[in-house]
Amino acid sequence: MYIQSRVRLLLPILSFLWIATACTDEAVHVQKELYFPLRSYLQQEIVQLEKHPQSVHKTMILDGKKEVRTIKEIDWEKEWALFIDSDLNKPAFDKSYDNLSEEGFRWYSLKIGEKLPVKKMKIQLDALERPASIEIEMSQTNFLFETKKKLHMNFVDGKIETYSIEGWQKMRWGSPTQYQLLGVLLTK
């Protein structure tokens, strides 16, 4: 009799708990973005450029040899891959950067002792908190090579106007290769 009364008391409690947990939405683990959401911002820009294509006046310099072209169709994901991959909002990076930001300016600097390719990221924001300019410094060194890159993007009204990548790479047993790329989005 004692056990039966305990079961009768326990059954409604267990039923209530089961219903309460069954009716809640599954917890979605969304990582809070600690840094400026560069990847998602650029992907939004790419979507807009795919809807409203723009030509690009592109200047490329490789070891002093210059080439200038106007390109009408461009794969923006590939073109801006270095910028997109520079996004700092990755779970492994959450404690790797000092946040030196102030109002209207985002500045992230790699902490001493960390070994990640993005060393600094500076983002100047306009009055509406959209990027006005982005500057990224990257470098990597290993047994075979050393590489340094500076990436820049300039914006007008939150839309990309120009972008540039300049850098050099030196293989351990070779001479350094220097390169520059400047892209200017042309209005129709």
List where the protein language model places each region.
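Post-signal peptide N-terminal segment of mature Sec-exported envelope proteins
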Residues: 31-54
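Gly/Pro-enriched, hydrophobic low-complexity segments
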Residues: 106-188
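Surface-exposed acidic loop/strand-edge motifs in secreted or periplasmic proteins
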Residues: 46-128
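Bacterial N-terminal signal peptides that target proteins for export
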Residues: 2-11
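Poly-acidic low-complexity segments
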Residues: 5-6, 37, 75
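C-terminal motif of bacterial Sec signal peptides marking the signal peptidase cleavage site
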Residues: 19-22
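Bacterial signal peptide processing site
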Residues: 24-27
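Alpha-helical transmembrane segments
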Residues: 14-17
